[in-house]
């Protein structure tokens, strides 16, 4: 909503179950009311509170229930309770923590996320909140987030459907005694590696927990002319419904892989592509390779499937993550309430 994101935040209040999207003027008023209730409870200025909602589109917020919930807020609650409270169709929580030494102090970074269906950023029914205690300016933190989100959350897809609601938020309270992390310094790149670790882990957790999913798919594209092209092709492959159903059926159908790479909106020489499923080559310079069926069947039966394409066009690479497409995905979304 307007006015909820124009200053830096100190706290975030989240509700799940109702997206508060397409709810008109009343929905906007309800968002500001949530902000006010949280600010009063936490005894901070209202503009320092961020608001996020996830759930069914078009339903009004049950404000009486929410107001009662705010009366039970605690400042030092259990992080696991928060991770559970923000879920919708997710089957499990998604959290990650990492520590790194900067000078004479240790910086801690922690992340929590939700997301299972309507996942195809940029825009997805996903939320991710990352907190740390590093001494870093808001501007530098924003730049790090912008860089890392491109190769993590923006590289996942569950079903190709975007959504009305998503948010990735990084906050730092600056409580450690490390020297301020400056952009382009050695500490900045170390900090970005921490952020990359957290956000990659959370992104893969969302992909792994895709609605009805039984397998995580990781696609790596190497030998591209540009990193953006590699990422585009990787996401095209992992987002293909035919690739996803082949993975669900444990069928090493490389034809679907090369086809989905080919319709990515970038150019490459289709006659120079290598494809590996797991460690097994199935296509070399765009010619099929005989492989041991029992060996590849063992790979296809695993819960994590890796697919690698080498374009032999350059030195850049990119990755994307998704999941298989099962009968349960149809069941879940056929029965999901409106």
Question: How would you describe each model-predicted region?
Answer:
Residues 32-33, 37-153, 158, 163:
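Glycine-rich, mobile lid/loop segments that gate access to catalytic sites or pores
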Residues 12, 16-25, 47-66, 157-180, ...:
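Short, surface-exposed loop/turn segments at secondary-structure boundaries that line and modulate
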Residues 232, 239, 243-338:
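Internal helix-turn-beta structural module
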Residues 1-8:
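Short, small-residue-biased leader/transition segments that mark boundaries at the very start
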Residues 174-248:
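A glycine- and small/hydrophobic-rich beta-loop-beta segment
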Residues 31-34, 63-86, 181-206, 241:
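Glycine-rich and small/hydrophobic secondary-structure elements
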Residues 137-202:
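Acidic, glycine-rich loop-and-beta core segments that form the ion-binding/anion-interacting portion
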